[in-house]
Amino acid sequence: KNDLFSMSHVNPQRVKDAVTNLQAYAKGQDCGDFFVRKAKKAETDHAGQIVKKERPARVAKQYKFTETIEIQVGLKNYDPKKDPRFNQPLVLPLMPKTNTRILVLADAADCNRCQQDNVEFHPFDTLAQTFDKNKPGPIKRWAKKYDVILCSKSQIKNIVKVLGPTLTKINRQPLPLEPTDNLKAKLDDMRRTIRIQFKKVLGLNWPVGMVSDKAEDVTRNCMLAINTLVDNLKKGWQNIKVINVHSTMGPSKRIF
């Protein structure tokens, strides 16, 4: 743990403080002046003295979902056309978000496994009957309902033949499911996996936890994601312009 934190230019205590305050904000608690707020005009009394206005107490809003905590990274001195792109999966210790939807494109054996473990699947043999590879629209709408798509190892080479290149173009390239894989463990890994990815834009973001998680666990996810990104950048920390942490419905806090 100390080795992980010591090789980062980001102060882990600052990250933890930001996460803790986001959690407090989600509960409706006052976070003081921790977050950057819009400037307010100062009022004066008749004697010309500045009067401090009391800020009204916050009331936590109730949402039908659990807020996710994300990190946002802005890059600098990085040319998407010249500098290397990367796409590295990273399995985090803590599941970074809820409701990760996973689909298995299954051969006959994996259809049985998925049924036994109550895992959503689509028989691979029926894909050609369901979709036309020359009509990408329906394939896109179907695939985008899922965060992760797995495919039985026996059929992984036939994906493009049956569905064309559409899944790759929308970043839903199926990942192989080995016959020897423990299905439940595989899905657990997928739910804890984020992709440290750079393609064209200089702004990157990843989920690293939920406001209901322990601040220490979210902090560790943050540090792992940041350090993995830095390892992939051409000039490391010299390519990092800014790093913010924020929650789904909350404000942002700069941590670098």
Give residue spans per PLM region.
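Long, charge-patterned amphipathic alpha-helical coiled-coil/hairpin "stalk" segments used as oligomerization
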Residues: 121-233
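Polybasic, low-complexity intrinsically disordered tails and interdomain linkers
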Residues: 1-158, 236-242, 248-256
